[in-house]
């Protein structure tokens, strides 16, 4: 019996515009099938009831997922006033109601209280583990799940529209770990009412933006025409804010063997000039950098004391 083919060596990022009613896992499987890729993963789960940006990594790009996940995210969402549900979105059962309908002015007035570093209690229906079990599994079994508040960073929060008295459309830019559903609940409570997320769309993840995204049906059509590669972004796309180091073929060879390379004074200065503000403010002189040979990612590593030590090597060819 012939061995089943494992897939092709496809490397890069596909910025999928995930449709509603599809899990992130299903989306990854669909993209992996289209490209017949050996390996695939995604940068940040998007619930079935949400649409929008789902960056999908293929092949060697999966090694950069941790960096993509750390980037800020932008969500556009609609709060429906007057009803809180078990899941804090339109899928759950209504558990609390209110006749209070805030005005646009009242909504805008409370938003500054929810920016910066705030304490947020995650939804009971979330993937957070409680004593080794997922919170949503416990909640579905009928248990009263009590999660502790944790710090999250809300970079910006603004009111976009109030189409009617029952709805408000907002946009939030946040750091890792923030929940839109919790934000909707907390804003509603601050306004003396109840609320849940009626619609949710993610429009940015780190450096990945909506304009670069491709719908699944478009991707399938491109694949049918033999043009799926047009939607594939380079592996290093998720590493745009990391200092880049141009190296020679010989240096590339050494790094792929796991050996460090010596930085020329010029290279060291160029890397330092590219450092991010938080790295400059830190006391440690070590910082992460990306080595590139002819524009192709070779390795991620630590630059320190005139040397570059690889920590993660990419198996890519020019």
Swiss-Prot record:
It comes from the Bacteria. It catalyses: uridine(55) in tRNA = pseudouridine(55) in tRNA. Keywords: Isomerase, tRNA processing. The active site is at 47 (nucleophile). Its EC number is 5.4.99.25. One of its GO terms (biological process) is mRNA pseudouridine synthesis. SUPFAM superfamilies: Pseudouridine synthase. Belongs to the pseudouridine synthase TruB family. Type 1 subfamily. This is tRNA pseudouridine synthase B.
